[in-house]
Amino acid sequence: MKTLVIMEHDGAALRSGSGAAVGFAREVSEDIAVLVLGDNLNAMTTEASKFAPVLAADHPALAAPVADRLAHVIVEVARAQNIELIVATATTWAKDIVGRTAGLLGGAMASDVIGHELIDGELRLRCPMFAGAANATVV
């Protein structure tokens, strides 16, 4: 399963959750790449290259983290790279962008994942529901 990890950063360094997102991606896929979005990304792409091959969308128009703009870029990258799974941190920033990306791709987004299994090539995610009163398995 070809996987793309969206690396979150603050403009100077990657956020710590990005490493956890890469760790999850490695557990479910052998074919991963990371995507860094923004402007003046040299420091972030160098740091990201320690995790996996890096794809960078570096442009002044991407300096502000506007979800609509970034989601369209992620969609173009996902289509060009034949990505099957997009992974990101569990932050408000990532949920906004990945939710829009999923909509543009005609897919779905699973958030706040608390567990996963890979059974016969099928990824199953455990997510809380009803304010944590129950858990659901999403296929």
Model-predicted regions and their roles:
Residues 1-139:
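N-terminal glycine-rich FAD/FM-binding segment characteristic of electron-transfer flavoproteins
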